[in-house]
UniProtKB/Swiss-Prot annotation:
Classification via InterPro entries: Ig-like_dom (IPR007110), Ig-like_dom_sf (IPR036179), Ig-like_fold (IPR013783), Ig_sub (IPR003599), Ig_sub2 (IPR003598), IL-1_rcpt_fam (IPR015621), IL-1RAcP-like_ig (IPR041416), TIR_dom (IPR000157)
Residues annotated as domain Ig-like C2-type: 32-134, 143-232, 242-350
Catalytic activity: NAD(+) + H2O = ADP-D-ribose + nicotinamide + H(+)
Function of the molecule: May regulate secretion and presynaptic differentiation through inhibition of the activity of N-type voltage-gated calcium channel. During presynaptic differentiation may regulate both synaptic vesicle accumulation in axon terminals and subsequent axon terminal remodeling.
Organism, scientific name: Danio rerio (Zebrafish)
Protein name: Interleukin-1 receptor accessory protein-like 1-B
The keyword NAD is annotated on this UniProt entry: yes
Family (UniProt): Belongs to the interleukin-1 receptor family.
Glycosylated residues in this chain: N63, N122, N138, N213, N264, N331
Residues on Cytoplasmic side: 379-700
Bridged cysteine pairs (disulfide): C53-C118, C164-C216, C267-C334
Alphabetic keyword roster: Cell membrane, Cytoplasm, Disulfide bond, Glycoprotein, Hydrolase, Immunoglobulin domain, Membrane, NAD, Receptor, Repeat, Signal, Transmembrane, Transmembrane helix
Length: 700
């Protein structure tokens, strides 16, 4: 019994002497605290885990058996963090249990995460250390937690071994573990160059498609234990210095720049794979680093990653000069280096003398191109541009203010028995389309002989008078017009011929079809050379009936400019009670109506003539919105005897009873009304005088 006590004392002393100091955190209540051990336990939810007391694996030179023989006790405590209050662990013997110097969780749960301290002590000695445990769930849709993977790197075309780590606690001693390997959580048909032995996966020739996550799985009782390794593949380690891509490495680059302008220099380089070493690239001016220069105008940018593949990198760095000065001129060098060497490229900045040759040529070229563009635009859209200018900034024709009509329309009617499809279209154009468009759409006032001419003298004199009162002469040139020589009337009358030759009136010649094969066409060409102010416009056909067609724009351009007149109010138009005996002749022009009325009233009764003349002439002068006329009817005298009207032409369908100043039989007395139907029954047609039948009026 006496020999046993000294033996225990010697064993206890040996244990105490075998303690080694690693990194003491401190001593609290006489217990040496080694803080948290570097080995951290990380396990997935539902997997078993064994936490071993680190005191026996690096802090003391004794194992659990020796410590227990020396009378030291091992106790376990848990805390949420290392600084929190520690509490004793309740061991249930089933899920949580103690096994010699280790603590088992079968399986681990999320609430088991924390710090576990093992304390080795007796009445006179105390030492402890903490181990961290993390329990986590699998990432969504995966068989591992992405934060618990081991990282491994492999070089392209070389071999690599992937170990299934930390599985010795789950393998019986003396036996090899049975490991199943997965890639990206799925079974894989491994190629022949990949060999599996026990807990090792060996890749003999690493390829780029070997990049991925490798999971090893072993069976431990009723539990599964998984370990995942992320493999990244890199290019082989380089043994060469970086390569400068821009500017050229073996050539001096000269840049001629103007002073005062900004400058930006860029250096690009290629770095082979050098492990975890960052690329080194920078600018220097002469022998000085850019950051050592006193100028704030000159600065260097951060290194920019252009691209990266398998660890090989292409990077760039920029040098910026806000405003180039004389002292900034010189050599700027871009340097690149790694563990195998350094290279550089030089850019020389020099001042550029001002040369205006290129600038002058460019300016003249731009002006020439602009001039060509404007000329082409004017050629293509001359009429549209002139109409736009005239409508917005033009003024009305002052020289034509004393003329009553904007245009006189000359046209040859076609006999109905000679009509064809072409002549019908020409007749429709001349009688309907042309007047309607010019009068109703554009607001022009036309003189159309068949509609507006009432004879006051010979036919030629009437035509000359009406043409003289018009600003333009529109000749609708049709084959029938050429055959009948419709222009002869303008050659027979001296006044008309002088107007055409002297340019007193502008002529608009509208060709409705091809006239070159028509008889008398040579005379048409001679007529064109005779007219001083002539514009020839071709009518394309019914397809150009829209107002925005080229034909109507050109015709509007040749017509005199006039601004749209405001619509007449009710007071400006004669009502039925104020229109007098000519109320039903609203389509007859004022000038023609006055002439016809004066001729008719000359043969009427003197009293009737006097009363009607005074009343109607006053009303016409005051209320008609075109113009007023003063016309004195002779107190005596008669018109020449009227001849019987032939079947050639009717100037205007005017009741003879009104033109002669007579009342039809049975008409009420003065001041009384007669129905329109009764008046029309007794209407007669105005016959032509003998002198007016000398020239056919088929041609207007």
């Amino acid at each position: 019994m006496r020999s046993r006590v000294p033996l225990q004392i010697l064993l206890y002393a040996a244990v105490i002497r075998s303690l080694k100091v690693v990194s003491k955190r401190g001593s609290v209540d006489g217990c040496t605290d080694w803080s948290v051990d570097y080995l951290r336990y990380r396990v997935l939810l539902g997997e078993p885990v064994r936490i071993k007391c680190a005191l026996f694996y690096g802090y003391i030179r004794a194992n659990y058996t020796h410590a227990q023989s020396a009378g030291l006790s091992l106790m376990w405590y848990r805390s949420a963090t290392h600084t929190d209050h520690e509490e004793p662990i309740t061991l249930d013997g089933t899920r949580t249990l103690k096994e010699e110097d280790a603590l088992w969780f079968r399986p681990a749960q999320l609430q088991d995460s924390g710090h576990y301290s093992c304390v080795l002590r007796n009445s006179s000695y105390c030492m402890k250390v903490s181990m961290a445990l993390t329990v986590a769930e699998n990432s969504s849709g995966l068989c591992y937690n992405s934060k618990m993977r081991r990282l491994e790197k492999a070089e392209l075309s070389k071999s690599k071994d992937i170990l299934c780590p930390d599985i010795q606690d789950y393998t019986p001693a003396g036996s090899e573990p049975h490991v199943t390997w997965y890639k990206e959580c799925r079974p894989k048909q491994w190629r022949s160059s990949i060999i599996r032995t026990a807990d090792l996966l060996s890749i003999r020739d690493v390829r780029e498609d070997d990049i991925g996550n490798y999971t090893c799985e072993i069976q431990f009782g009723r539990f599964l234990v998984r370990r995942t390794t992320e493999l990244t593949v890199t290019a082989p380690l380089t043994d060469k210095p970086p390569k400068i891509l821009q500017p050229p490495e073996h050539k001096l680059s000269v840049m001629e720049l103007q002073l005062g302008g900004p400058v930006n220099l860029t250096c690009r380089a290629f770095f082979g794979y050098s492990g975890d070493v960052s690329p080194l690239i920078y600018w220097m001016k002469g022998e000085k680093f850019i950051e050592d220069l006193d100028e704030t105008r000159i600065r260097e940018s951060e290194i920019k990653m252009v691209r990266e593949h398998l660890g090989e990198q292409e990077v760039s760095v920029s040098l910026t000069i806000d405003s180039l000065q004389e002292e900034d001129l010189g050599n700027y060098s871009c340097y690149v280096e790694n563990g195998h060497g350094r290279r550089h490229a030089i850019i020389q900045l020099s001042r550029r003398e001002l040369m205006y040759t290129v600038e002058l040529a460019g300016g003249l070229g731009a002006i020439l191109l602009m001039l060509i563009f404007l000329v082409s635009l004017y050629k293509c859209y001359r009429i549209e541009l002139m109409l736009f200018y005239r409508n917005h900034f033009g003024s009305e024709d002052v020289d034509g203010e004393n003329k009553d009509y904007d245009a006189y329309v000359s046209y040859t009617k076609v006999d109905p028995d000679q009509w064809s499809q072409e002549t019908r279209e020409e007749e429709h154009f001349a009688l309907e389309i042309l007047p309607d468009m010019l009068e109703k759409h554009y607001g022009y006032k036309l003189f159309i002989p068949d509609r507006d001419l009432i004879p006051t003298g010979t036919y030629i004199e009437d035509v000359a008078r009406c043409v003289d009162q018009s600003k333009r002469l529109i000749i609708v040139m049709t084959p029938n017009y050429v055959v009948r020589r419709g222009w002869s009337i303008f050659e027979l009358e001296t006044r008309l011929r002088n107007m055409l030759v002297s340019g007193e009136i502008k002529v608009i010649l509208i060709e409705c079809s091809d006239l070159r094969g028509i008889m008398n066409y040579q005379e048409v060409e001679a007529l064109k050379h005779t007219i001083k102010l002539l514009t020839v416009i071709r009518w394309p056909g019914p397809g150009s009936s829209k107002p925005n067609s080229r034909f109507w724009k050109q015709l509007q351009y040749e017509m005199p400019f006039r601004r749209p007149e405001p619509k007449l109010s009710h007071e400006q138009v004669l009502d039925a009670s104020e229109q007098g005996p000519f109320g039903e002749l609203q389509t007859v022009s004022a000038l023609s109506m006055v002439s016809a009325t004066s001729t008719a009233m000359a043969t009427a009764h003197p009293d009737l003539r006097s009363g009607f003349h005074n009343t109607y002439n006053t009303q016409l002068r005051q209320k008609h919105y075109y113009r007023g006329y003063e016309y004195d009817i002779p107190s005596s005298g008669t018109l020449p005897p009227l001849a019987t009207m032939g079947s050639q032409h009717t100037y205007c369908n005017i009741p003879m009873s009104l033109l002669n100043g007579q009342r039809p039989p049975g008409q009420p007395a003065h001041g009384q009304q007669q129905s329109l139907e009764e008046q029309q029954v007794n209407n007669a047609l105005l016959p032509l005088l003998p002198r007016e039948t000398s020239i056919s009026s088929v041609i207007w």
